[in-house]
Amino acid sequence: MCAARLSAAAQSTVYAFSARPLTGGEPVSLGSLRGKVLLIENVASLUGTTIRDYTEMNDLQKRLGPRGLVVLGFPCNQFGHQENGKNEEILNSLKYVRPGGGFEPNFTLFEKCEVNGEKAHPLFTFLRNALPTPSDDPTALMTDPKYIIWSPVCRNDIAWNFEKFLVGPDGVPVRRYSRRFRTIDIEPDIETLLSQQSGNS
């Protein structure tokens, strides 16, 4: 079953995919981001690393956005039910609960989606097939089987909230990072891609 899903993601870039912003409106085509370096994360409001990862995502977008980085967050409730609110509740949860203190993401958040299983968003099926394991933890798997609430279960499944996918300015996925790899520590790899981007322009 997992191998059969490869054909569904027989694309070479992320530009074939689109997603609807959390705030509503028309779907955003990732094709509109050609030439940008993309950092894509599956996020959750109630995770143990929510504060760390959201603030680091904001930091990278603020500092590197003007040079061509675009951070994209996809809320997902598949890991410990840690994004169990409705789409319209997520921004208030971030603002008042975690991270709290009036926090507002300065990057694009999309509507809740699934990232594993039969109902996975096609973008994440593509990303998982393009980069089957995190570069920093090739043996990463869901640590507790009772949390697996999707089917089919595949070897390339995302293991938890805040896995990261770095995509080059040509739309090709470059590297995948586990939940344990801090968002801010991706900066050197982003810098490398940004320098390649400016060298090609």
UniProtKB/Swiss-Prot annotation:
Protein name (Swiss-Prot/TrEMBL): Glutathione peroxidase 1
Gene behind the chain: Gpx1
Function comment: Catalyzes the reduction of hydroperoxides in a glutathione-dependent manner thus regulating cellular redox homeostasis. Can reduce small soluble hydroperoxides such as H2O2, cumene hydroperoxide and tert-butyl hydroperoxide, as well as several fatty acid-derived hydroperoxides. In platelets catalyzes the reduction of 12-hydroperoxyeicosatetraenoic acid, the primary product of the arachidonate 12-lipoxygenase pathway.
Keyword Mitochondrion attributed: yes
Subunit structure: Homotetramer. Interacts with MIEN1.
GO CC annotation terms, alphabetical: cytoplasm; cytosol; Lewy body; mitochondrion
Transmembrane segments: none
Enzyme kind, highest EC tier: oxidoreductase
Native source organism of the sequence: Mus musculus
Documented EC number(s): 1.11.1.9, 1.11.1.12
Tissue expression pattern: Expressed in liver, kidney, lung, brain and heart.
Active site: U47
Record note on disruption phenotype: Mutants are healthy, fertile and show no increased sensitivity to hyperoxia. Mice display enhanced susceptibility to paraquat and cortical neurons from Gpx1-deficient mice are more susceptible to H2O2-mediated toxicity than neurons from wild-type mice. Gpx1-deficient mice are smaller than wild type littermates and the liver has increased mitochondrial H2O2 production, increased lipid peroxides, and decreased mitochondrial energy output.
N6-acetyllysine modifications at: K62, K86, K112, K119, K146
Main location: cytoplasm
UniProt cross-references to InterPro entries, sorted A to Z: Glutathione_peroxidase (IPR000889), GPX_AS (IPR029759), GPX_CS (IPR029760), Thioredoxin-like_sf (IPR036249)
Processing and modification events after translation: During periods of oxidative stress, Sec-47 may react with a superoxide radical, irreversibly lose hydroselenide and be converted to dehydroalanine.
A single MF term (Gene Ontology): glutathione peroxidase activity
Subcellular location: Cytoplasm; Mitochondrion
GO biological process, one term: fat cell differentiation
Residues with the Phosphoserine modification: S7, S32, S195
Similarity-based family: Belongs to the glutathione peroxidase family.
Lineage summary: Eukaryota, Metazoa, Chordata, Craniata, Vertebrata
